[in-house]
């Protein structure tokens, strides 16, 4: 009886180690490109927006943001985004008249993806945006001259240039975790 229990315990420990290793923060190839993590669709969703427009005539989109599980847990516990945090943005066009629905919109074709990574490449506390195509294995850093950086710097508030107003469930979870004890 002891051996089967030992084997089960060892198996569970190994499975836990593999799960933790799957989300060990960002990694980069020899050219400095971000290696796109697998199974991002399993990451906790922290926000979704509809018809949010950044650039004027980009068309209506449904945007979904997911966060790597290790950083999510750390952020909820401490109220801070640890170095290595990855936020995955998926941008899709809305689809209409999808049977059997009689109205409304659902997610349609993907039109863009990017990862916002707290990698501190430009100094302490900084994040880098990495763009990538569907099915890509690596993502290229988006130049810091692009508007996404200045917009996040100017409008995201004091939370690591992350738009917490778009992620109410994450914001609420952080507030509960870091609430002063009375």
Say what each PLM segment does.
Residues 25-59, 78-182:
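Sequence context surrounding c-type heme c attachment/ligation sites in exported
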Residues 4-5, 68, 115:
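Small/flexible residues
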Residues 61-72:
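Short, structured beta-strand/loop micro-motifs enriched in basic residues and often containing a Trp
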Residues 14-22:
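C-terminal segment of classical bacterial N-terminal signal peptides
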């Amino acid at each position: 009886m002891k051996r089967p229990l030992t084997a089960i315990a060892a198996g569970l420990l190994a499975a836990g180690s593999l799960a933790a290793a799957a989300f060990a923060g960002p990694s980069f190839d020899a050219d400095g490109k971000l290696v796109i993590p697998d199974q991002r669709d399993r990451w906790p969703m922290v926000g979704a927006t509809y018809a949010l427009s950044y650039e004027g005539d980009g068309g209506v989109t449904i945007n979904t943001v997911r966060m790597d599980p290790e950083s999510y847990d750390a952020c909820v516990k401490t109220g801070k985004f640890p170095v290595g945090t990855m936020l995955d943005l998926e941008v899709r066009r809305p689809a209409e008249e999808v049977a059997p629905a009689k109205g409304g919109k659902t997610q349609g074709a993907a039109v863009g993806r990017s990862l916002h990574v707290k990698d501190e490449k430009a100094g302490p506390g900084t994040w880098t945006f990495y763009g990538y195509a569907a099915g890509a294995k690596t993502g290229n850093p988006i130049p810091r001259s692009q508007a996404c950086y200045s917009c996040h710097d100017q409008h995201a508030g004091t939370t690591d240039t992350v738009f917490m107003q778009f992620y109410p469930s994450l914001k609420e979870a952080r507030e509960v975790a870091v609430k002063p004890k009375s």
